[in-house]
């Protein structure tokens, strides 16, 4: 046996030992899940995870190996959380649309082992999470080309019991999908989500193609596939084309080559750890009140990564505001900022905590 074979044999032997230890560890995870269910405890415990990682690093004598072992332990904890979610019936994530929609693609990246729950509207995604039918919801929040998804921000405002717990940036490549054998000259109408249509506006104008908005890109692709009509085309992902038996006639028709959609993850569980946090607030309709809030944030030392305004529901010509701040949401400075904003604003609410 040469040196390579001997080393591989050693790895195989260790892997066999790890398999037995993995089963033993997951049996303990099962006990943890049952305890959490009995006592109403959340799956994620940030303080516990941090302590486990520090203890794990201390066990490794070779400094060069410590970061790799911490990654290994973090992966084991992530697997454990997925298993706990399955045991506790929380292994469901909701999205708007059908299989192949960009939200579905984002969901699969975020929750590869979750049961994906399809909803007809964004409102239904929020409702499913609020009812407990899904532990998480994945919805688009903004696009680097087409801008904000205002309706989703309004839903965040209207659902004060839900939190934003994660964000995910999905690079978007819009493609013109057709029935097999279709030529560009045959197309008379194009179907897609309004955002995808806006992202592909230059291409559509160039070829004088009228577009009709649908609930999402995957539904548009399914509609074209089911129609059997070569005069119809859809704008969607290449993954969606494969899913519904369509061909990519023209790839990457979106105007912005760096097109990215940011998705947010909503949950009933309040997040605790991250390097960014977002707030929703309102101010009295008086001169200088918004400027005063911005000055308070600036004086606190937090960088304001984003600020948006939206009309308040049922209150004509008044607005609520969204801000995203860079910083530790658990720091004393954050608590001080929230106290000062509570004094300055008419209303203020912590919306989300996440890592970006």
Predicted regions located by residue number:
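Domain-level signature for soluble enzymes in the chorismate/prephenate branch of the shikimate pathway
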Residues: 1-356
């Amino acid at each position: 046996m040469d040196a390579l074979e001997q080393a591989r044999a050693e790895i195989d032997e260790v892997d066999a030992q790890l398999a037995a230890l993995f089963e033993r560890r997951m049996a303990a995870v099962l006990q943890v899940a049952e305890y959490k269910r009995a006592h109403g405890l959340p799956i994620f415990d940030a303080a516990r995870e941090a302590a486990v990682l520090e203890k794990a690093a201390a066990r490794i004598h070779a400094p060069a190996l410590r970061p790799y072992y911490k990654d290994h332990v973090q992966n084991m904890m992530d697997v454990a959380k997925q298993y706990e979610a399955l045991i506790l019936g929380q292994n469901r994530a909701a999205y708007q649309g059908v299989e192949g929609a960009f939200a579905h693609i984002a969901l699969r990246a975020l929750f590869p082992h979750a049961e994906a729950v399809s909803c007809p509207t964004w409102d239904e995604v929020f409702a499913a999470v609020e009812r407990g039918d899904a532990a998480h919801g994945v919805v688009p929040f903004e696009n680097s080309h087409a801008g904000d998804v205002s309706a989703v921000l309004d839903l965040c405002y209207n659902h004060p019991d839900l939190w934003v717990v994660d964000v995910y940036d999905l690079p978007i490549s819009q493609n013109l999908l057709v029935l097999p054998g279709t030529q560009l000259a045959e197309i008379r109408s194009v179907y897609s989500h309004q955002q995808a249509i806006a992202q592909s506006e230059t291409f559509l104008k160039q070829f004088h193609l009228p577009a009709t908005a649908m609930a999402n890109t995957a539904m548009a692709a399914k509609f074209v596939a089911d129609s059997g009509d070569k005069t119809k085309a859809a704008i969607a992902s290449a993954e969606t084309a494969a899913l519904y038996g369509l061909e990519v006639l023209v790839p990457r028709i979106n105007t912005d080559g760096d097109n990215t959609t940011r998705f947010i993850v909503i949950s009933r569980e309040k997040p605790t750890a991250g390097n960014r946090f977002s707030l929703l607030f309102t101010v009295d309709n008086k001169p200088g009140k918004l400027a005063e809030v911005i000055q308070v944030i600036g004086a606190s030392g937090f960088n304001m990564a984003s600020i948006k305004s939206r009309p308040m529901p049922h209150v004509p010509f008044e607005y609520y505001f969204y801000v995203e701040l860079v910083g530790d949401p658990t720091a004393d400075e954050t608590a001080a900022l929230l106290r000062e904003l509570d004094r300055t604003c008419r209303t203020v609410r912590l919306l989300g905590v996440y890592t970006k």
